[in-house]
Every structure is written in C-alpha cells, then in structure tokens.
C-alpha cells in the first residue's frame, strides 16, 4: 500500500483521541449542570440530522431514475473487433472449498481470450481444504493458484495487494468466491473504459442476488441491493460524488490502481475506503450495466457477521479520512465533503441511534412522560414527526422500488416488515463498535454456499495444476507465499486442519 495514504492500522490518532475526550468531558459537564438544555440541543441535532439525511438520499434516488448505469450496446462490443487488452482477475479465497467447483465453472464461462486473461486464485497457504478443492479442479491456464503467507493482518485487502503486485493485465477485476459474473462482463468493461474519460479509473458492476426468495432476510437483502446498485450508486456517479465501491466486481485501470497504492490491508471495508481515495485524487467511478450474481445471506448470524464488519469498516474509513478535515475538504471540495459526511459518517450513526429513538417514542406513547415531551419543543417535534412518518415511508418505498427494478414483484409486500431489518442493522452496528475497540482488524468470515445453487454446476474440465512456485520456493516478500514451512506443508499434506483465514 502507498505509504503516503492514511491507514486504518491505527484506529484513532492522538489528536482524534484528544478531541473525543474533550467532547465527552463537555457533555458530562452539560449533563451535570444543564441537563435539559443539553438534552434538547441533542434531540434537535439528531432530528435535523435525520431530516437532512433523508432529503439527501431522496434527491439522489429520484435523480437515479434519470440516468442509470453505463450501458454498452451490442454495436460497441462488436466495434472492439479482435482488440482484447490483457485482463487480470483476482479472486481471494479462504475456507471456500464448497464453492470452488462452481467458481471455476463460472470463471471458465467468461467470454475472453484465454491468452489475454490472467486469473489469480489467491489462497492462504494453511487453508488445506480450499487447496484440496483447487487441486481436485485440475486447473489449467489462465488459472494460477497463488499461495499467500498466512500473516497479520489476515484480511482480504492484504491478499488483494499481493495479487496486484503479480497482476500483468492492463485492466483488473476483483471477484468473490461465490460470484457469477455475466460472461461478457470483461468485454463490456473494456468497451466502457474505451469510451469513458481517462479520469474514470473504476467501473462497479451491478450486484444482484440469485436467491432472493429463500426467506424474509434474503428478500429484504435483495431489495436493499437493488436500491444501492441500481439507484444510489448511479446517481452518485452522475453527480460526480464519492462512490462507495462494493467489495466485488470492481474493474480498474491497473496502472491507476497501483498509483493509488492498492487497498488498505487494515481496513475491513477496503472497497469503501478505496472509493473515497479515488474521489480525493479527482478521479471517478462509474457503474457498469453488467450483473454479477451473488448469494444472499439466508441466516441471521451470518448476516450479522457480515453487516457488523461492513459497519465497522464504515467507522474505520470515516476516522481515517477525518484525521485532517481541512485537507479532506480541500481535496474533495465542499460539496463532496458534505456528501462524505452523509454517506460514510451518518450511515453507522443512524444505525446506532435508531433503537434509542424508537425506545424514546415507545416510552412516551406508553407513559406520556413530561421529561420526554420537554425534549422536543414544538419546532423540533413537528420536524421529528415529519421525518419519522415520511422518512419511514420513503425508505420502504425505496425497497419496493428495488424489488420492481429487479423484477422481484412477489417480494414487494414483504417490504412492510423493513423495520425488523433495520433492527438487525442496529444490532450489527453496536456489535461493530464493540469489535472496533476490541479487535479493529478482525475480519469476520462470511460463509458461502449455504444455499443450494439454483442451477446445476458446470463440470470443470480436467487438466494439470500445481501451485505457482518460483525457483522451487516461495519468495519471502509474500507475493506468491511467504513462510515456506506453511506453504510447503499445505502443498504436501492437504489433510492438515485449517487454522487461519481472513480475520
């Protein structure tokens, strides 16, 4: 990673810790001597914040209907002729033995010349089960299995950085193990990069779930994805605002990605962080009208692990970029600086305080407490009522619109249960805060392959495979491995127990 960039290796700088301590002390003093005044100011600030956040997202969503993702018509694909620049595909793997077969089958369906393609499967050297599955797949070029040193931090961005060092393609894309990209996605990305300005260094493909009907959780999750990738991100790109990347199907100009320094290995939402750095450099992200199919989390525990990691990463990213607010405003511009506050700062804060506000509302309805009533003078009360009623309606309407955009019409009625989903978000947010203090760089693994494939997997073609080793040993810089003992043991004895991963 580029040493000139701030990193999440340190959660709080001394300056941030000092400011935080001063704010806490000031709050304690106000609570001690001016309890009601402080409470009213706090209630007014929260109410106003909700109103601003709701208005911001409403404007973005309405504008999204005017301009969708970047489309690549058939004639533009045909206009490429035989020109196919080299392309690198990075796939970080850890404990993915169950999905390796389908992953390989999906990547083999990519409509791109094999001699112009480099597919790097990045696997930690002590992940015996996944290595055995890769061995069974009997891979041939353009597949390469790169053994990664299982060293700290054991995160996806660290592994991606090692892949970036090895990448030989003019363009580069990152996929997750459960991804099923459309076969022509690489060609569409090439055509889009060809017609877009050089300042566009990243294309985010649309993500959709292939199992939206599994249960209530997947229905709500799929609708959320519909609003995010089909509405919010295209609108952000249209207004040239910072775009929070998804963790997969990010297509890059490789040279620009290297110039940025790759990913922050200590940030558990490295995609969000990278999207902000792209904006700070004056570069742009666009959304590509090509779909990558993913597996929606169908189990609450698995969903909470994933969402708490995302929210922890949002807080990490906010703290990293706000270490120098004046520099951030100068590099982003005032408009984009304010958008950053709404997109990155307000997201975890809203999830954290939602249950507190719901609790206050319920307590007032049940008890009629005069103390709670005094917290909300008439001006604050009416703004709060409008924000609560209209805001909740609008967010449910967003989810219904997401269902319509994805043709999940049967799921629309279930969006009325969205408050249950928001409650789960709040639980995940508080879990994220606790984990940020205790284990800031811990990567909670999301289990894949929990839902049966909707279509049968394509049989992998047999061939020869061996781990990529240079001069009979793994280089000590960690590019294709690191600690030789761990790597050689994984290659020789694939029955050893797995003891590591993206943590």
What are these regions (language model features)?
Residues 85-88, 118, 258, 273:
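Cell-envelope/extracellular polymer assembly enzymes that use nucleotide-activated donors
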Residues 108-152:
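Acidic donor-binding segment of Leloir-type glycosyltransferases
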Residues 135-141, 145-165, 169-170, 183-268, ...:
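Long helical/loop segments within the catalytic core of UDP-sugar-dependent glycosyltransferases
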Residues 268-274:
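Acidic donor-binding loop at a coil-to-helix junction in glycosyltransferase catalytic cores
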Residues 275-293:
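Catalytic donor-sugar/metal-binding loop of nucleotide-sugar-dependent glycosyltransferases
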Residues 27-57, 63-71, 75-79, 342-438:
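Membrane-embedded multi-pass helical conduit in multi-pass membrane proteins
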Residues 55-115:
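N-terminal signal-anchor transmembrane helix
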